[in-house]
């Protein structure tokens, strides 16, 4: 079964890269969307923008700020193994 990765809506390039690698990608529109995700990727523009870092999820949260889509994919892979 594909790992479920939650991402913020503005990260469309990351969404495409993760889907290409076989991940199940869901858009996080509210903190509840992070539940059940194996990993979450946030922009980092507004720290804890959706309350995701407030232990809504036990999954790793990756801040995408300053990273390319490929770097984010590598980080996701290393965090969910």
Curated annotation (Swiss-Prot):
Pfam families in the cross-refs: UPF0180 (PF03698)
Source species, domain of life: Bacteria
Stated family: Belongs to the UPF0180 family.
Name of the protein: UPF0180 protein YkuS
Organism: Bacillus subtilis (strain 168)
């Amino acid at each position: 079964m594909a790992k479920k990765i939650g991402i913020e809506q503005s990260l469309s390039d990351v969404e495409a890269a993760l889907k290409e690698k076989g991940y199940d990608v869901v858009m996080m529109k509210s903190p509840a969307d992070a539940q059940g995700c194996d990993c979450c990727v946030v922009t980092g523009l507004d720290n804890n923008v959706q309350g995701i870092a407030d232990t809504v999820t036990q999954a790793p949260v990756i801040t995408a700020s300053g990273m390319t889509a490929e770097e984010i994919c590598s980080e996701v892979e290393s965090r969910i193994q």
